[in-house]
């Protein structure tokens, strides 16, 4: 909804590694933070990301409503193994009234974590199905 932009959402921060690449992440581990995600942020440097953390494994989807830039999305299982990768997902810039027109991206298997990083990260750092998520601190 349009009032989402007006609400301040505080994201805890943490550090993770993917393929030994360290990233500072904003952590979305509550319903309000997961709903807000990276909406309305102007950019995301290559050494930062957003880590969605879920209480149990499931088929969690993402969409790009109110995003300002394209993203790479990586779904991980509870052991940190890559389940699904979606590269260069474009923003969905449509009026909020027809937000249902934004496509959702669903993994091929159940995940516990989803990492959003700026588009090009997966290619730059050779992230593949063999890559591993290591949580340093969240």
Describe the role of every protein-language-model region:
Residues 2-138:
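Compact, glycine-rich, soluble single-domain proteins
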